[in-house]
């Protein structure tokens, strides 16, 4: 199959960090490994992208960048859209801000086929944007598990938990800086964050792949998420996760190595510290269980179980 993936007008793979660009690149590598041909379109000029698309003559086009949604009606091939916006949840739509008019209202107008990263995202498109359920397909993110080293020894930082994310308002890291064993890695975009407290700097990707496994568990207590890649990366490195209720997409929250902090307890630092400690103790002692769980999120599995069957349904059903 020939697939064109439309991404943001940025380098793919990314030079540094860039979750969407990394996801697109990992999808390409995994699809090609499975025998498919993949074209990445990330030119800032839509006319140039249409020219390249026409020359490639894809069987399917996948728009993976919100601001290119207006291209959808003009694409003469079977097509679907995926958005990575953090607040696409019926109960969080009041946080959309300018995104609503710029992007979400375009979904309401165009009503495209959607490959949603979670069921809650698809529910939002159905009930708020008015998109028919037969145009909504679940399509979770995947992870390149083979990129991650997994230690078979006692982790170097056995008693540390790691908050690995861009340090910003949505991720809320500054709230938890009184938790003594919680460390932070990521570029800083929030002046409320105190760099003198357990800050590890910004990690390069290769450093992440080699060193994530040396921590006890991962923390992600943001106030909005789509399907956070960092949780899948944690599992691939053998770590359990402590997450907010907005970061639970596609996860089995009954697992003992997945701890969900209710939003009404997000300011209860003593409670959160206790939950992080409990999760860390369990996770360090049950790494094989976590690694087994992580296999369902490997890209080749996600593509085989969701992505390619979804494409076939769109093509065969002539859904547009």
PLM segments and residue spans:
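Active-site proximal beta-strand in glycosyltransferases
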Residues: 3-4, 60-63, 72-93, 115, ...
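A charged, aromatic-enriched C-terminal amphipathic alpha-helix characteristic of glycosyltransferases
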Residues: 19, 270-319
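Membrane-proximal helix-turn-helix segments that form the acceptor-binding/catalytic region
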Residues: 87, 94-115
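Acidic anion/phosphate-binding donor-loop and adjacent secondary structure
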Residues: 91-92, 126-127, 135-159
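A short, active-site helix/loop in glycosyltransferases that binds the activated sugar's phosphate group
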Residues: 105-135, 145
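Conserved donor-binding/catalytic core segment of Leloir-type glycosyltransferases
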Residues: 115, 153-171, 177-181
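Aromatic "clamp/platform" in nucleotide-sugar-dependent glycosyltransferases that forms part
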Residues: 223
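Short hydrophobic beta-strand element within catalytic cores of glycosyltransferases
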Residues: 240-244, 250
């Amino acid at each position: 199959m020939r697939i064109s993936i439309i991404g943001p007008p940025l380098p793919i793979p990314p030079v540094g960090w860039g979750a969407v660009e990394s996801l697109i690149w990992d999808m390409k590598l995994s699809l090609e490994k499975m025998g498919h041909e993949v074209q990445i379109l990330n030119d800032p000029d839509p006319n140039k992208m249409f020219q390249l698309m026409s020359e490639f003559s894809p069987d399917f086009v996948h728009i993976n960048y919100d601001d290119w949604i207006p291209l959808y009606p003009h694409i003469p091939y079977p097509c679907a859209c995926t958005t990575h916006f953090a607040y696409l949840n019926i109960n969080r739509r009041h946080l959309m801000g300018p995104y609503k008019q710029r992007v979400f209202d375009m979904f309401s107008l165009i009503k495209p086929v959607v490959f949603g990263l979670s069921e809650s995202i698809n529910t939002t498109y159905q009930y708020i944007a008015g998109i028919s359920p037969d145009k909504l397909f679940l399509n979770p993110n995947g992870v390149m598990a083979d990129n991650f080293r997994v230690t078979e020894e006692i982790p170097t930082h056995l008693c540390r938990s790691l908050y690995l994310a861009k340090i910003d308002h949505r991720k809320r890291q500054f709230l938890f800086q009184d938790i003594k064993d919680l460390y932070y890695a990521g570029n800083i975009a929030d002046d409320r964050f105190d760099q003198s407290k357990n800050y590890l700097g910004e990690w390069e990707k290769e450093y992440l792949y080699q060193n994530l496994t040396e921590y006890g568990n991962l923390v992600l207590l943001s106030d909005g998420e789509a399907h956070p890649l960092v949780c899948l990366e944690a599992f691939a490195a053998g770590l359990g996760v402590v997450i907010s209720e907005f970061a639970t997409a596609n996860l089995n929250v009954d697992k003992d190595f997945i701890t969900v902090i209710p939003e009404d307890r997000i300011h209860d630092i003593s409670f959160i510290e206790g939950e992080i400690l409990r999760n860390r103790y369990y996770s360090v002692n049950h790494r094989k269980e976590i690694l087994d769980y992580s296999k369902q999120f490997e890209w080749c599995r996600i593509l085989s179980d969701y992505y390619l069957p979804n494409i076939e349904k769109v093509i065969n059903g002539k859904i547009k």
